[in-house]
Amino acid sequence: VLHADETPVSMLKPGNGKTHRAYLWAYATGAFENTKVVVYDFCESRSGEHARRFLGDWRGSLTCDDFSGYKALIASGVTEVGCLAHARRKFFDLHAANQSQIAEFALQQFARVYDIEREVKELSAEQRQASRQQHTQPVLDALHRWMLLQRQKVPEGSASAKALDYSLRRWEALTRFTGDGQLPVDNNWIENQIRPIAIGRNNWLFAGSLRAGQRAAAVMSLIQSARMNGHDPYAYLRDVMARLPMQRASQIGELLPPRWQPA
């Protein structure tokens, strides 16, 4: 199981001193996986070819939003896992705009799903799947029937129709988590790993070149992966830098954040 997301980063154009929008792509192992790693990939654009190049022939479950850049991966055999938080956000915005009763009811049902998720978070994958099948699936089945009924009533092109269509169009992917205890309910896990990058943009403003962005992405991958594994990033990097010159190439994996032990 992998999570994927991307965020814009300004990159300096060579020669003219101006910047253009590049992207930092992020890929993280699932929140329920034993190995916790995030890898950032700095690229010149948001083209889906970057995700295809990075993931290569990997074929697993990819948690992502509705961005078209992931569609070719899904068409090639990657299993799409939707983000229920994105679906919920459509109704949240709808309710904030006009106190929609449709949005209010949908939000109540999403809240029920998330209440169950909080209860099963620490369970085994098998127990989580059983609980989702018993408790979550009936809620989602009823919500789906209700959405289909409401869609027949609302005007085409209305804000309500757009919120409903987002969920209905992606329903299979959005509810895939109920059949597998290893799958997440949403993509918030990767968004949390991108948040430090978004905050950092206010301080470092732009990448000086493509190579500079790629080097920064490599270092940030180590730092954030260290955090994910409960390590102090400074202590981790200091220890690794001291040991790296003497580390055998065959044992270099021992210095990666999931396997690192302080000397």
Where do the language-model regions lie?
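Catalytic center-proximal scaffold of phosphoryl-transfer enzymes
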Residues: 1-263
